[in-house]
Amino acid sequence: MCPTSHSRLTRTLNAIQTLNVVQVAADRRERNRAARRSQYLRAAMRIVSDDGVERLTMQRMADDLDCAVGTIYTYFASKDALLAELQRVAIERITDSYRLLVARTDPELEARARDETEAALSRLVLGLRFWVHTADVYRDESNLFRALTTRRSRLAPTEAAQTLPAAWQLFALGTTGVQAAIDTGAISPGNAGERMVTAAAAIGGVLLVEGIAHFDPELFAGRSLALQLVDDLVRGWGADPDRLAAASALADALALEGPLVPDVPGIDTA
């Protein structure tokens, strides 16, 4: 090999090596940043779990993590941005859990229901009961979702883009169950989306009475009231009482055979 060719090859190899070093360093920085971001999210979730959504502030996080407030702002532009990310993670956890429930129960419904009408009605009852029980199993996630739906200020476009796709996905899964019940004649014709919104809002509202259950545990038994509300809603949507009784019995059996709210690892275990 002539000296010129050898020199050119050496320069090329050196350039490749330099690029590799730069890429490795960039990858390491990105991993470190992702790990740090996850650390902040876990800290935020702990605050929500211990003291509630209203206690989540950047200063509280900085105190808990022994870091400067400004450091947190390099990862999240505002408290709303941090809260939006927490809500996205929370909603996705609930959604994944619901998908696991559907994957477990759908084959059983097809095999054990008397017909497609009973299967669709049982699936609807299971889905609404799932929503009730997430308040117990995924308390923090449910509180974060409630904070999204009850906030007084308008969600900023950047936060909306961060959170709403996950919320719409969960909403769509619930609406599909309502629509299937309509399509099979299990409940009367109507707007499936409006019914799902009504159900979610009503269940969430009833569950709020748990906050005063210590005054009268029987009167303000939020979960029991919410489960009764599920039956009232489905009956109000036109379900035949005998059909509803059979579908509820099948839903009861399936709930006993596996978790009604399957476990999905959360950010606190990441």
Where are these predicted regions, by residue range?
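Generic hydrophobic, amphipathic alpha-helix propensity
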Residues: 36-44, 61, 86-90, 94-98, ...
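Hydrophobic alpha-helical connector segments
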Residues: 85, 99-141, 196-199
